[in-house]
C-alpha cells in the first residue's frame, strides 16, 4: 500500500509539472508596472540653452505572447502612454513629451517545456510614436515654442523570466533595451531649430500573467 501511495504521488508530481508548461500553441498575457529609464547621458541640446535631460516614467505595461513551439515565443509589448519631463540646468523643467513604444520580439525560452521556471531572451524591433508634446511656462519664457518629435524605429533586446504559479497564473520579471533616436523640431526666439535626441532607454517590468 505504501509503495502504491509513493507511486501515485510521483505520477501526480509529473502530471502537475506538465500542467504548468509553456507549450506550443499557448497564448498568455502579462500586466504590471513598466518603467522607462533613459540611459545615462540621454537627451540632446536645445540651441543656445545647451544640453537637456529626460526623466524616468512608470506606466501600466502589457505583453501578449504566443508560443510557436515549446521554446520559441512571439511577444508584443504595449503600455499606457509614457510621460517624460525635459529640463536643463539653467531653466529646470521646460517641456513634457508623451510617447508609446510598441515592441515586437522573437523569444527563446530556456529549459524544458514542463519547467515552472522559464528564463528567456529576445530580440526584435521597436516603434516609438511621440505625441502631445509641448513647452511649459518656463520653456516659453526662454523663447521656446512649437515642439514636435519625429517617430522612431530601432532595434530592441530583452531578458526575462517567468515563474509559473499554477496552470493559469504566472509572475514575470523582464528588462528591455531599446534603440530610440529622434529629432526634435521647435522654435527658439522664432527661428526654426532641429536637434537630435537620444533616449535609448532601459525598460523594467514586473508583472503577473494569465495563460489562455
Swiss-Prot record:
Residues 1-21 form the signal peptide. Changing residue 20 to Y: In strain: ECOR 46 and ECOR 50. SUPFAM superfamilies: OMPA-like. Its main location: membrane. It comes from the Bacteria. It is found in: Cell outer membrane. InterPro entries: OMP/PagP_b-brl (IPR011250), OMPW (IPR005618). Coiled coil: none annotated. GO terms for cellular component: cell outer membrane. Keywords: Cell outer membrane, Membrane, Signal, Transmembrane, Transmembrane beta strand. GO terms for biological process: transmembrane transport. Belongs to the OmpW/AlkL family. Acts as a receptor for colicin S4. This is Outer membrane protein W. It comes from Escherichia coli (strain K12). The gene is ompW.
